[in-house]
């Protein structure tokens, strides 16, 4: 039975395609594990929904992954982590559930001066979880919350470097370009897919970071702690599902997994 558990897949879910940026890090750090990814593109973006709606959709996603045999679950969505992680852990006490949050602490530690911009959904920036992060680390540096409604939709449509998304990001970031910006935190798992565009706009001196590595390190730690890590020496399997059940969205998912 323990061997079955070790070989069981790790479930990832997100409001759409963004969580693939976190899954990509897992494939890099733990290639021998099996994975299931569930993207809820039918209901994307979560960032414009109420906390109650986000919780309901998150419970549906976890039920899907558990029925597929997931041994652990990664909430690869900042918005869902903020709104639902506590309730999910309370309900599913027997399964490790790992969330993701804006990487504000490492962003502040990187530099002794300069402001930090946190790009995220409105829902993430207004939740208690982010307010707690601000209380903990915001006093050490100017932290600029920057809601980006509309950016998720570009990525869901596969527009990662077109003129429209470049203009959108330029309009968002231009008001801050006369300040000393030390780093930008990508507080939505969709946003790493447009990291190169952001870097071009702000310049190479600005560090751009996200929470993927920290989340996967925590996943690894929890699996080891519970003696659940795979002992296979072979590359694991990956199954991708999406609530849209659209062939194009699955093709785009596979393409995004391969982008470095």
Curated annotation (Swiss-Prot):
Keywords: Cell shape, Cell wall biogenesis/degradation, Isomerase, Peptidoglycan synthesis. InterPro entries: Asp/Glu/hydantoin_racemase (IPR015942), Asp/Glu_race (IPR001920), Asp/Glu_racemase_AS_1 (IPR018187), Asp/Glu_racemase_AS_2 (IPR033134), Glu_race (IPR004391). Its EC number is 5.1.1.3. The active site is at 77 (proton donor/acceptor), 188 (proton donor/acceptor). One of its GO terms (molecular function) is glutamate racemase activity. PROSITE patterns: ASP_GLU_RACEMASE_1 (PS00923), ASP_GLU_RACEMASE_2 (PS00924). It is an enzyme of class 5 (isomerase). Pfam families: Asp_Glu_race. The keyword Protein transport does not apply. Pathway: Cell wall biogenesis; peptidoglycan biosynthesis. Substrate binds at residues 14-15, 46-47, 78-79, 189-190. GO terms for biological process: cell wall organization; peptidoglycan biosynthetic process; regulation of cell shape. It catalyses: L-glutamate = D-glutamate. Provides the (R)-glutamate required for cell wall biosynthesis. HAMAP family: Glu_racemase. Belongs to the aspartate/glutamate racemases family. This is Glutamate racemase. It comes from Clostridium perfringens (strain 13 / Type A). The lineage of its organism: Bacteria, Bacillati, Bacillota, Clostridia, Eubacteriales.
């Amino acid at each position: 039975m323990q061997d079955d558990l070790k070989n069981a897949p790790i479930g990832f879910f997100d409001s759409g395609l963004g969580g693939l940026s976190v899954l990509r890090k897992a494939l890099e750090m733990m290639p021998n594990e099996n994975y299931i990814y569930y993207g809820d593109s039918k209901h994307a973006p979560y960032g414009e929904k109420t906390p109650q709606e986000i919780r309901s959709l998150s419970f549906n996603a976890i039920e899907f992954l558990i029925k597929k045999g997931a041994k652990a679950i990664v909430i690869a969505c900042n918005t869902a982590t903020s709104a639902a992680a506590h309730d999910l852990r309370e309900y599913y006490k027997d399964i490790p559930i790992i969330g993701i949050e804006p990487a504000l602490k490492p962003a502040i530690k990187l530099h002794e001066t300069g402001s930090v911009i946190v790009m995220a959904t409105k829902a993430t920036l207004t939740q208690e979880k982010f307010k707690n992060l601000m209380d903990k680390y915001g006093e050490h540096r100017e932290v600029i919350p920057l809601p980006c409604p509309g950016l998720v939709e570009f990525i869901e449509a596969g527009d990662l470097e077109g003129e429209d998304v470049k203009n959108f990001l330029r309009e968002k970031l231009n008001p801050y370009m006369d300040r000393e910006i030390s780093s930008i935190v990508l507080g939505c798992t969709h946003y790493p897919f447009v990291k190169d565009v952001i870097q071009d706009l702000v310049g190479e001196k600005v560090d751009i970071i996200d929470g993927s590595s920290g989340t996967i390190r925590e996943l690894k730690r929890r699996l080891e702690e519970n003696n659940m890590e795979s002992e296979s020496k072979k590359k694991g399997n990956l199954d991708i599902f999406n609530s849209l059940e659209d062939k194009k969205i699955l093709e785009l998912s596979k393409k995004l997994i391969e982008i470095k």
